[in-house]
């Protein structure tokens, strides 16, 4: 995730990155990397609270180029596929699908069981995606 944010910073003139971090992602960052949450935040143009369901990315009128979910946990994948939007990540993904914007989901390692593959197929069928990037005006 941090590497992707660093790469996207090269295109600051045309891409503004917005970051939403789930509790699970916070735990993964802490347990599996040497990065702090503050270091992750430093690479995004704007950070949104995952529990603020009224934030800009939750609205179809909030114009974005698309969304990337990385890494995408099974819980998040199922939420996106089923349309269950109880947090900002899921709501933003739902809006991204509804508005037919570009979307990318990069599942975590180990999501290769049959049920997980079925959810990935559903997501591909829906033309799915999440970081959110917003077009600069």
Name each model-derived stretch:
Residues 1-104, 108-137:
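A cross-family phosphate/adenosyl-ligand binding-site feature
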